[in-house]
Amino acid sequence: GDVNEEYLPDENAGYIVNCDIPMTGSTWDDKSDTSLHFVYETDESEEDYDNGYECTALTLKKGDKSATAEEEYFTYNYDKNFLKQYKVVTKEGKEYIYACALSYNDYTDVMVFDINDDDIKLSGVFTCHLVYDTSDPDYYGEFIPTDPENMYFGQVGNLFGTYTCYGRHVVGDDGMPEPADSVYKISWGSEEAKSLKSINVTMLDDKYNEQGEETIDAGEHFLPIRTDNSSFVDCRLDDGRLVRLKITKTDYPVQIDGEDVDDLFEGLVYAG
C-alpha cells in the first residue's frame, strides 16, 4: 500500500542501518575471499567453544584492503553475537562501519572503519558506557544509533561521586563520534546526596541561565541532573529550585570552592 510521505526517509539526510557483515576467525580466513568481512584474532588459551571466543583484535577486510583494531578484547559467540554492526552513511555520502563490542565494566568499544575511496582504514576506537536511566526503571543498556546527526552515548563522570551521563554526538569528518552538545544529562548518580554544611551555589532559572549567588543550608537534598563533565554540576533541590555547583578541582579529591566534595556532602556514590 501507499506510505505517508512524512514517514519516508529524507534523501538528503544521512542514515544508520544495522548490518550483518560475515565474521570468521583468522585460522579459517580464506585469503582469496574478496567480499567485505571481519576477521577476529583469538587468545587460544581462552577459547571456549560453548561460551565463545575471547577476541584480541578485529580486522575488516575486502580483497587486499584491510584495517585492524588492535588490542580490542571482547567475546564473540555464534549464538549470542556481542559484536553489533552498523553502516553509517552521512548526508555528504561518506560511509563508515561501526563495530560495537561490549568491553569491560559495562563499557562498549565502537571500532570505526572508514570504507570510502575503495579503501579500508581504521579511524579509531570510541569508548562509551551503558546507560541506566533512573527515571525509567525498565531502561538499561545501549543507545542504538539511527541518525548520524543524533547519536546518544553514555559516559562516566566523577565530579559529584560517580555518575553516568549521556549527550548527543554527531559523525565527524573522519567518521568518529564527536560531542555535539557541551552539557550531558545525568541518568544515574548520587541520588541521596545531602549537604553537610552551608554551601554557596549559583541559582539557575528553568532555562539553566545563571541568576546570582545564594547560600544553601546544611541538610538540603541535592539531585544531580546535568554536567559539562569539567567545570560544573547542576542539581535540583527538593523544592524544585535549580542550582549550579562550580567545580574548582576536577581530579580526586574533587573540590567546590576549594573544599573537598566529600566534606561538603554525604551520600555520594562511588564506583570502580
Which sequence ranges carry the predicted segments?
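Long, charged/polar, surface-exposed segments that mediate recognition or autoinhibition
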Residues: 85-129
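Terminal domain-start segments
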Residues: 1-81
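Exposed regions on extracellular, virion, or secretory-pathway luminal proteins
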Residues: 29-33, 43-50, 63-70, 79-80, ...
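Short beta-strand elements that form the blades of beta-propeller/WD-repeat-like
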Residues: 14-50, 92-105, 111, 141-164
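Short amphipathic beta-strand/extended segments with alternating polar/hydrophobic composition
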Residues: 37-39, 66-78, 125-127, 181-190, ...
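Surface-exposed loop/turn elements that mediate protein-protein interactions on large endomembrane-trafficking
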Residues: 54-76, 111-129, 167-182
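Repeated scaffold domains used in trafficking and secretory/extracellular systems
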Residues: 78-88, 127-146
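Acidic, small-residue rich beta-repeat scaffolds with periodic aromatic anchors
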Residues: 1-19, 23-26, 136-272
